[in-house]
């Protein structure tokens, strides 16, 4: 590899490395979208009287007393356990079942709960009426959304609540459908007066100091954001920001809360209403409100609730762009298609070997086989350059500190012996898209979450003992030792020592699955290089240029 080309490669790798470190240390903060003030009828119009207009039918369901004690009902579904509360007739908790869906909380492991609310917030799937229907001005702190409801029917697979939403009588029935991570919700509104909207609320809370991650650094497991699919666009709402409500254009296909490898969302039978992100009542709290039109004081809704892992095939099965709940991030999004391809290959391999770590190792071997013709030619070029090292040493002695003349002479030597100095760059450049795609898969694919390999408990997290990054750094050093060294001694030392050390630092906190891939790839490169060197030892060195 020529000196200039080595500098180009080194500059490229260092630039990527510095960008990775910068994003890990200083995560990118997404700028808030331009506020879109929703119509006054939906959010900010002064409240209308709660009593029905003259001549309107009286409500069929009396409101429970405001100080009614809370009652809860638990429904066991396929892969989850949902607890529903009489406060708003809503979802109080939804815990995923199984050892895979656990997280560390202080000194113990607990099941992952997909409900994240704080004091003063409504619960997920509660309802809030617009002022025209007797509701509050501020939907994020609407006390009516937490108003007590009555349990009027309950069995092992369903529960029905009755109560009031503004001046409407409301009946809500939750049913376990038998599908993984799915509930059905039927809503019947009646007995009101006038027209307005009723919001189906999906709130979330996250401590304001929670880091969001950066382009190359994934968010923590408990990083949550309200999310909505309106029209053909999926938008996420930054809870750390402050500002006015943000209304999305287009009818709503689904809305809910995004939690890294998981999503909890409500999906109407067909696109309806509008979606508005509303902040409050405290910092770090907010919600997605799906405003559904109610004409003549009555409306029926049939909703599907999915709360579970972001399995690509499962989300695609719902249609409505639900697979866009998987957020590949800014840079990783560019490699999303490639990442999905790698995931399908790894799933196929894991089905055979029953271990995701071994599947990553086999993926590394497969990629090496696919790229073998190109890497073989590249290593041939590197070996030819190695044979020219004695001639390069003579040129260094001849030209001394005159780097310009020495570099020109080296390039002429390469041209004379038809050696491509760029050949040594090829293996790394070809692998870089695979690295980024694998990183995207590790950061977004729930299949790999909490999957162990050897001493690592989770391939999506960094190696807790830093064994793999150090081993990867050592293998990078060996690879550099086997590579032809630049004519420039200072540059040779940088390539030999600084590059492996810097690369090791970069890899300390990236997912262990990616470090495993690069380490195994380095080992295969070393073995291939050694075999080729042994095979070509008997070949005569090219004649020296004169």
UniProtKB/Swiss-Prot annotation:
Required for the insertion and/or proper folding and/or complex formation of integral membrane proteins into the membrane. Involved in integration of membrane proteins that insert both dependently and independently of the Sec translocase complex, as well as at least some lipoproteins. Aids folding of multispanning membrane proteins. GO terms for biological process: protein insertion into membrane; protein transport. Pfam families: 60KD_IMP, YidC_periplas. CDD domains: 5TM_YidC_Alb3, EcYidC-like_peri. It is found in: Cell inner membrane. GO terms for molecular function: membrane insertase activity. InterPro entries: Membr_insert_YidC, Membr_insert_YidC_N, YidC/ALB3/OXA1/COX18, YidC/Oxa/ALB_C, YidC_ALB_C, YidC_periplasmic_sf. Residues 31-70 are annotated as: Disordered. One of its GO terms (cellular component) is plasma membrane. Belongs to the OXA1/ALB3/YidC family. Type 1 subfamily. The keyword ATP-binding does not apply. HAMAP family: YidC_type1 (MF_01810). This is Membrane protein insertase YidC. Residues 39-60 have a biased composition (Low complexity). It comes from the Bacteria. The keyword Transcription does not apply. Its main location: membrane. The chain crosses the membrane at residues 8-28, 326-346, 356-376, 422-442, 459-479, 498-518. It comes from Anaeromyxobacter dehalogenans (strain 2CP-1 / ATCC BAA-258). Coiled coil: none annotated. It is a multi-pass membrane protein. Keywords: Cell inner membrane, Cell membrane, Chaperone, Membrane, Protein transport, Transmembrane, Transmembrane helix, Transport. Interacts with the Sec translocase complex via SecD. Specifically interacts with transmembrane segments of nascent integral membrane proteins during membrane integration.
């Amino acid at each position: 590899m020529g000196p200039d080309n080595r500098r180009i490669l080194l500059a490229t790798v260092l630039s990527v490395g510095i960008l990775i470190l910068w994003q890990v240390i200083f995560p990118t903060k997404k700028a808030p979208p331009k506020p879109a003030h929703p119509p006054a009828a939906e959010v900010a119009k002064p409240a209308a009287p709660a009593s029905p207009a003259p001549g309107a039918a009286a409500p069929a369901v009396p409101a429970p007393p405001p100080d009614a004690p809370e009652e809860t009902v638990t429904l066991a579904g396929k892969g989850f356990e949902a607890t529903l509360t009489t406060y708003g007739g809503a979802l109080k908790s939804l815990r995923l079942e199984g050892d895979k869906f656990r997280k560390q909380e202080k000194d113990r492991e607990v099941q992952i709960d997909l409900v994240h609310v704080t004091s003063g917030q409504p619960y997920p799937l509660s309802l809030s009426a617009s002022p025209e229907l007797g509701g509050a001005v501020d939907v994020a702190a609407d006390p009516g959304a937490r108003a007590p409801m009555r349990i009027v029917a309950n069995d092992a697979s369903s529960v029905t609540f009755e109560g009031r939403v503004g001046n409407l009588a409301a009946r809500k029935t939750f049913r376990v459908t038998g599908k993984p991570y799915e509930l059905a919700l039927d809503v019947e509104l009646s007995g009101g007066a006038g027209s307005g909207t009723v919001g189906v609320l999906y709130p979330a809370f996250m401590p304001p100091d929670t880091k969001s991650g950066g382009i190359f650094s994934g968010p923590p497991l408990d990083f949550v954001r309200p999310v909505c699919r309106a029209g053909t666009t999926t938008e996420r709402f930054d809870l750390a920001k402050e500002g006015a409500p943000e209304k999305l254009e287009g009818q709503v296909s689904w809305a809910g809360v995004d939690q890294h490898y998981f999503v909890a969302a409500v999906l109407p039978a067909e696109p309806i209403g509008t979606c508005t992100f509303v902040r409050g009542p405290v910092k770090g709290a907010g919600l997605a409100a799906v405003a559904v039109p109610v004409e003549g004081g009555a409306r029926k809704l049939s909703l599907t609730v999915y709360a579970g892992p972001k399995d690509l095939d499962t989300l695609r099965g719902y249609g409505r762009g639900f697979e866009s709940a998987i957020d590949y991030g800014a840079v990783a999004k560019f490699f999303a298609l490639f990442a999905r391809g790698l995931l399908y290959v790894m799933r196929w391999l894991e089905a055979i070997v029953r271990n995701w770590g071994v599947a990553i190792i086999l993926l590394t071997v497969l990629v090496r086989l696919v790229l073998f013709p190109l890497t073989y030619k590249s290593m041939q070029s590197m070996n030819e350059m190695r044979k020219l090292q004695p001639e390069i040493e003579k040129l260094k002695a001849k030209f001394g500190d005159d780097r310009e003349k020495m570099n020109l002479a080296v390039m002429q030597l390469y041209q004379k012996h038809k050696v491509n100095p760029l050949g040594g760059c090829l293996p790394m450049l070809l692998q870089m898209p695979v690295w980024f795609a694998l990183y995207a898969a590790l950061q977004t694919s729930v299949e790999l979450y909490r999957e162990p390999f050897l001493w690592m408990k989770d391939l999506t997290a960094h190696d807790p003992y830093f064994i793999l990054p150090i081993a990867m750094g050592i293998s990078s050093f060996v690879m550099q030792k086997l590579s032809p060294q630049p004519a420039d001694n200072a540059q040779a030392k940088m390539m030999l020592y600084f590059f492996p050390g810097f690369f090791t630092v970069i890899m300390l906190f990236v997912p262990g699955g990616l470090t495993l891939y690069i380490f195994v790839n380095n080992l295969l490169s070393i073995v291939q290089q050694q075999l080729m060197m042994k095979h070509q030892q008997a070949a005569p060195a090219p004649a020296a240029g004169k």
